């Protein structure tokens, strides 16, 4: 395999056996074929590695050291190991639209001033049923908006691999590492968005209260660090108070059994035609043959780099 490809698709995973194969299948369904798939295990114990060890394609690298180091460390590892000029993010429980890489790559190549581009998303449940659309409005890159609302939809982000190497994720900000990265770089980075949903984001019906509260606590730490120089002390205090009120509202909503409703408010409801289109795309992805996962698919060699195994 050549040492250089146009795009590295990086998927960090931990205990994702139930969803990982579908995520991988969506990579093989891409209309752009000059990619490498970098699968980084973060100490799985559920057989996730065994589920993808069967992959037989020279564009795939499966890497694991047996340890649990956390998402930030694995994302930085992906950037360090990427052979591609461009790097596309993805999580192990999500699914890419077949045109995702092609369309993001076209934008980045057409306009070299753009550093990072994300896309709108379909949200879906655990059964891959489309639920709604999010992120189909233009980006607001003003510092206060970035502090208040975030910016990019993290698993859909694609950019030059060198950008990610220059701007690593900070492991101090667990569960909000993406928000910290966008805020840290918002005055020196140009962001863009494709407002067509090119990604399927898996979203549980109720979420997790403790995770949500932990995220908001981390966001308040980020606001205190970056807010004053960007928007001033007074505006920062208001943003911190807003975060506290959101935590109170979410805690109350959980007690009242309204978690699903709170989550659904983030989405735009799908029209009937959009539901049909989304289902058709997902069906096509699920029917995409993958060497090694499907007995009748072509089976070239795969590079594996796991403890005790030499690279192919």
Where are these regions (language model features)?
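Conserved nucleotide-sugar donor-binding catalytic segment
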Residues: 80, 97, 119, 133-222
């Amino acid at each position: 395999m050549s040492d250089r490809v146009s795009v590295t698709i990086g998927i960090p995973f931990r205990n994702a056996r139930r969803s990982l194969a579908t995520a991988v299948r969506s990579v093989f369904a891409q209309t752009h074929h000059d990619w490498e798939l970098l699968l980084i295990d973060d100490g799985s114990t559920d057989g996730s590695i065994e589920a993808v060890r069967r992959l037989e394609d020279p564009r795939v690298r499966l890497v694991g050291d047996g340890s649990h180091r956390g998402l930030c460390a694995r994302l930085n590892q992906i950037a360090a190991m990427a052979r591609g000029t461009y790097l596309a993010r993805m999580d192990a429980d999500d699914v890419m639209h077949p045109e995702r890489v092609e369309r993001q790559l076209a934008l980045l190549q057409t306009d070299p001033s753009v550093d990072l581009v994300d896309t709108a998303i379909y949200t879906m449940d655990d059964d891959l049923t489309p639920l709604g659309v999010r992120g189909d409005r233009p980006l607001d890159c003003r510092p206060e908006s970035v502090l208040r609302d975030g910016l990019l939809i993290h698993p859909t982000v694609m950019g030059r691999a060198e950008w990610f190497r220059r701007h690593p994720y900070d492991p101090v900000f667990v569960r909000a590492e993406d928000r910290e990265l966008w805020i840290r770089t918002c005055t020196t980075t140009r962001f863009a968005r494709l407002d067509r949903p090119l990604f399927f984001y898996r979203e549980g019906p109720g979420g997790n209260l403790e995770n949500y509260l932990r995220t908001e606590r981390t966001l308040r730490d980020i606001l205190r660090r970056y807010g004053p120089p960007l928007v001033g002390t007074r505006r920062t205090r208001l943003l911190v108070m807003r975060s506290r009120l959101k935590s109170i509202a979410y805690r109350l909503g959980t007690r009242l059994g309204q978690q699903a409703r709170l989550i659904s408010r983030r989405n735009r409801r799908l029209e009937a035609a959009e539901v049909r289109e989304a289902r058709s795309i997902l069906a096509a992805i699920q029917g995409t043959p993958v060497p090694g996962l499907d007995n009748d698919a072509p089976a070239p060699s795969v590079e594996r780099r796991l403890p005790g195994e030499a690279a192919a």
